[in-house]
Amino acid sequence: MKNSGSIQESTSSTGISVLIVLALGFLMATLDVTVVNVAMADMKNTLSMSLSGVTWVVDGYILTFASLLLAGGALADRFGSKTIYILGLAVFVMASCLCAASINGQMLIAGRLIQGIGAALFMPSSLSLLAASYLDERARARMFGLWAALVSAASALGPFIGGVLVQLAGWQSIFLINVPIGAAALISAYRILSRVPGKSSRVNIIGHLLGMMALGFLSYALIQGPSAGWRSPVILVAFTAAVLAFVLFLLREISAKTPILPASLYKNGRFSAAQFIGFLLNFALFGGMFMLSLFLQEAGGASSFMAGVELLPMMAVFVIGNLLFARLANRFEAGQLMFVSMAVSCIIALLLFVLISPDFPYWQLAVLMSVMNLCTGITVPAMTTVIMQAAGQRHTNIAGAALNANRQIGALVGVAITGVIIHLSATWYAGAGFAFLMMGAAYSLAALLVWLFLAAHNGTAASEKM
């Protein structure tokens, strides 16, 4: 694949190289979410940070990342996916150096905010570049499965890798490891990725500012709500501002000559349904894993290290699910795989709602959660495939950005609501039961959406050209 050439169907070896290059960026972004969790205590003590301050080390990254994803997709459309991907990687690596060199909490939080900006730039572009490298829909689906497997492996191993790095070289090492990974990704991206020319259309600056404000205020309210109190003035103002900004964003989208999400995407039932399924998936997944990490320690008596060990098999099956999708994609439509996976997840979540009790053994919990997460591992690349097919080649950047934004907001909402459920429950077992019920409701709604909008289209062409 030539550096300046147009996108053509990838050869097998070149296609795998593209996959690895793009996965390196996702690897860094994913690791920096999971490894930070195990380093928070060391950061807090070394930099004399408050609990609220160290929380922002995690949440500040999510705030800028979620708020700027749509803008990242639009910039990739305007200036080219490869250009914005490389720019985002460079920003992320420099921000990692800033984090590692931090001498106080404010400097570390600033570095994390900038890391979120970099991730918001390169993550939408990576999906677009991967989609463009595989024009054959079956091959593209397989590559989405392999790509998701690499990312899932990073998520599963993140806490373990972070613990080893912190133990051997201090918390700074979890950021310094991004330097060699980022350098390899930058050099490889420049040499291997094809140049994707930008479009001459203007960037809807006002629309993006309103979208950023809506996502930013919503993210802030969800992040700060548990500590500040959901009825506190600052949280109520943030929610109100988010709603107002979202309404203005919709009005701007209707009237703008160059809307952020083209009207054809809004009207595409497959695209819209898959986007909402992405929200529901992360809502259930992150809410559930947040609950389990606390449940295993508070109700099960596990240490933080042992809780991580007990969660590992439940997380590792994501990789198996991703790889399984890559094999099943040749035989079944993405919508079929999504429906079966979501239906099974719903049944398991409702079963756990009934069974969870002090007498319920860990091994049964681990088996059921592993099957549920295996289904999620199948669903994620299937959902990505559906969205990229429905968006068409013209809109892959903004489609990928919208998917990532919806999933980030889903994760924030899921964790926030799960926290409220646990807080209001009389016991940890009651809280876990209601959390599983919430997950079952989300998975059932996702399965219904798949049945109505995706599975019914198996006999039609998989792609809807825009």
UniProtKB/Swiss-Prot annotation:
Pfam families, per database record: MFS_1
MF terms in GO: transmembrane transporter activity
Transmembrane segments: 16-36, 56-76, 83-103, 113-133, 146-166, 168-188, 203-223, 234-254, 276-296, 305-325, 337-357, 367-387, 409-429, 434-454
Entry GO terms, CC: membrane; plasma membrane
InterPro entries: EmrB-like (IPR004638), MFS (IPR011701), MFS_dom (IPR020846), MFS_trans_sf (IPR036259)
GO BP of this protein: response to antibiotic
Keyword Ubl conjugation assigned: no
Cell compartment(s), UniProt: Cell membrane
CDD domains reported in the protein's UniProt record: MFS_MMR_MDR_like
Keyword field: Antibiotic resistance, Cell membrane, Membrane, Transmembrane, Transmembrane helix, Transport
Topology of this chain in the membrane: Multi-pass membrane protein
First-listed, main subcellular location of the protein, grouped into a coarse class: membrane
Similarity annotation: Belongs to the major facilitator superfamily. EmrB family.
Known function: Resistance to the epoxide antibiotic methylenomycin.
The name this protein goes by in its record: Methylenomycin A resistance protein
Organism for this UniProt entry: Bacillus subtilis (strain 168)
